[in-house]
Amino acid sequence: MNAERDLSPLTPNIVRALNDKMYEKRKVAALEIEKLVREFVSQNNTAQIKHVIQILSQEFALSQHPHSRKGGLIGLAACSIALGKDSGQYLRELIEPVLTCFNDADSRLRYYACEALYNIVKVARGSVLPHFNVLFDGLSKLAADPDPNVKSGSELLDRLLKDIVTESSKFDLVGFVPLLRERIYSNNQYARQFIISWILVLESVPDINLLDYLPEILDGLFQILGDNSKEIRKMCEVSLGEFLKEIKKLPDSVKFAEMANILVIHCQSTDDLIQLTAMTWMREFLQLAGRVMLPYSSGILTAVLPCLSYDDRKKNIKEVANVCNQSLMKLITPEDDETDEVRQSPATQPDEDFSSNHENSSQHTTYNRTLPSAPDSSLDNANIFAPSSMNTCPVSLNLDGIVHVLDRHLHESTTGMMTRICVLKWLYHLYIKTPRKMFRHTDSLFPILLKTLSDESDEVILKDLEVLAEIASSPAGQTDIVTDCNDLPTGMSELHVPVPTKVTQAHGSVIRGLECSPSTPTMNSYFHRFMVNLLKRFSNERKLLEIRGAFIIRQLCLLLNAENIFHSMADILLREEDLKFASTMVQNLNSILLTSSELFQLRSQLKDLQTPESCNLFCCLYRSWCHNPVATVSLCFLTQNYQHAYNLIQKFGDLEVTVDFLTEVDKLVQLIECPIFTYLRLQLLDVENNPYLIRALYGLLMLLPQSSAFQLLSHRLQCVPNPQLMRPGHKQEESSRAPKEDPARIDYVELLQHFEKVQNKHLEIRHQRSGAGELLERRLVQ
């Protein structure tokens, strides 16, 4: 700059001094400028004041020469000091050139700019608040300055500005929040520290309600919470803690819905502190906001469910997640099963996409997880000024989204045991609270629920059975026409069973056991489908039948009607084409029937056959039990049909006696010695009235080889008393015994013919397999 150039009212000496490289000379020039401006102020000469500021700005502060810029900065500061309380009229002209120097490449010049702005702000105090955003923007950049002197200077200016904001009641929070939202996504540690420090200050000012704008900055706060610096993490943790305290104090004014998806995202963070903090917030939101959170249920479950399988290393997160899960579950009521006439209001309807609306976060952060599809996945920054009364608007349950999340967790092989248990608890809860809506999803859920029966955990299987039992017994699942197994959705397992024809039971005296599965008020159209598909699963997974079959059926007998289960399975097995499986399944069912404490009442019902219903059940079981000869005999023992048992054993001579057959006879002998057949053993005392029982037992004895079972049964039969010893009291006993009523005549001849027919089928199939095996062997030899 030409020092001789006319820059009046600045004198040539002042101009030369301002351009000097020596700081002391520039300082002297600044004092002269201060005197000059004071004189103009006393004269109220605003034109000259503006002219001086313009010269210092254009000719010095914005000059290409570094020393001139330094002179301009100190000159502008001198003007501000001279103006005093009147500096507010000229703040824009004073501040803008100084802020421009914040971007200077020379660190010394940036330091002088800090110093100049400090003096300007110190004089103006509250008058600078209308320019707060530009000051904050400049300071946020200097907070990350690599030069320690510049950073130190910016910190002094920062403290001064915070004091001014704290003292003032005219802070423009509405205008400041967009800038704060933008700057909060900085990745620089110093910039983050600067942002958090300002949030803490604003939180502490009583007249500033930052809580209203929390949805705008909450995501950024959680981003900062993951910073590598412990100090910054601690500051952010304190800030979030203060916000949460305010939320608890004033829940009615909190915009819970606008922050729900932010929490959902951060509840899935891989950073433990972020996840624990977000989960803690979610817990409080669920308890404070209640049903306002229902539209976000699927997203919440997406975040919470995996945490339930955490080990002790993340015990805190697991415990909080469990509370969140329980709280969310309690929000669902039977009213949610009503018609969908009440729609979500626009205020509570979640938006379509979080990332598209969050204009700033999309530039600064990438989320590794995706939320479930609409409507549980959004935040709309446009609603920041919406009234808090939005939280009281009616909400509806998005059951489709919830079921989608639950179904996905059941399908994923990596899902932990506790999570699977919780998913099944959720399904059971939904079938209890919202059965009508849940049955819309039953066809899609049925296959995975059946597959879950193969889970390694007994507890998972128990919960799965509870869900299946509720599906099979809920009145909401009853349809006008019983759904045939051939109508199941694609991919649903089914047995190859002919459609059972509905036979109207004749009023005659002979009972036929070929009717379809029972239809009772407690069973719906899904019950028969469940039985068909359960047997199909046992057929395809013999290991499941072997290891868990008895456990599953026994639990079902506790959850459902045992008679219906056995009646239905017997009816299905009667039409089973895989005869080997049918025999194995009958053997398992028979063992359960005879040994399980859960079936005590059913055994008592079959033991006496005193009602037409019990006789009908016996006939139904008998026809399927014919797939397994020894099981058929044991059923006759249970029902005290000793003569028919003897007749069956007589037919055993025509059967193919295998090792498996003899093993089953051995097990039956062992079973006769158990408490279940105590009544049978006592009946051996009444020799004359139970001759066929003794004959049947001797028949079993003759079938057995010389083994431990043979010795056991032989010793038992040796204890049978001599009929002659029992004869003296026989007449008296016979006269006192009332004749046993026969509630319905059972055609035992027809049943025996059915037994022969079924066993002939088994023999034919075995011969076919044997012949095919021999033919294959001959071909291999040739």
Swiss-Prot record:
Protein name: Protein VAC14 homolog
Highest classification ranks of the organism: Eukaryota, Metazoa, Chordata, Craniata, Vertebrata
PANTHER family per UniProt: PROTEIN VAC14 HOMOLOG (PTHR16023:SF0), TAX1 BINDING PROTEIN-RELATED (PTHR16023)
Sequence segments annotated as region (Disordered): 334-375
InterPro entries: ARM-like (IPR011989), ARM-type_fold (IPR016024), Vac14 (IPR026825), VAC14_Fig4p-bd (IPR021841)
Principal location: membrane
Quaternary assembly: Forms pentamers. Component of the PI(3,5)P2 regulatory complex/PAS complex, at least composed of PIKFYVE, FIG4 and VAC14. VAC14 nucleates the assembly of the complex and serves as a scaffold by pentamerizing into a star-shaped structure, which can bind a single copy each of PIKFYVE and FIG4 and coordinates their activities. Interacts with NOS1.
Source species: Xenopus laevis
Compartment(s): Endosome membrane; Microsome membrane
